[in-house]
Amino acid sequence: RISSSVIAHKTQLDSGKREVYSSHMQLGGPK
């Protein structure tokens, strides 16, 4: 059984990665 805090932490990390990825795409993609 996974605790809800772990799920919340993973969700936060995933959304952070998406923000970084979208900002990279706006700059013309990852360097």
From Swiss-Prot:
Catalyzed chemical reaction(s): hydrogencarbonate + acetyl-CoA + ATP = malonyl-CoA + ADP + phosphate + H(+)
Using the UniProt annotation, give all residue ranges assigned to the region (Disordered).
1-31
Class of this enzyme:
ligase
Task: Please give the coiled-coil regions recorded for this protein.
Answer: none
Which is a GO BP term held by this UniProt record? malonyl-CoA biosynthetic process
Highest taxon of the lineage: Eukaryota
Q: In which pathway does it act?
A: Lipid metabolism; malonyl-CoA biosynthesis; malonyl-CoA from acetyl-CoA: step 1/1
* GO MF term list: acetyl-CoA carboxylase activity; ATP binding
> Is ATP-binding given among the entry's keywords?
yes
Going by the UniProt record, its keywords in alphabetical order are: ATP-binding, Fatty acid biosynthesis, Fatty acid metabolism, Ligase, Lipid biosynthesis, Lipid metabolism, Nucleotide-binding
The reply on keyword Ligase is: yes
What EC numbers are recorded for this enzyme? 6.4.1.2
Further remark: On the 2D-gel the determined pI of this protein is: 4.86, its MW is: 16.9 kDa.
User: What protein name is recorded for this chain?
Assistant: Acetyl-CoA carboxylase
Q: Which organism is it from?
A: Catharanthus roseus
The lineage is:
Eukaryota, Viridiplantae, Streptophyta, Embryophyta, Tracheophyta
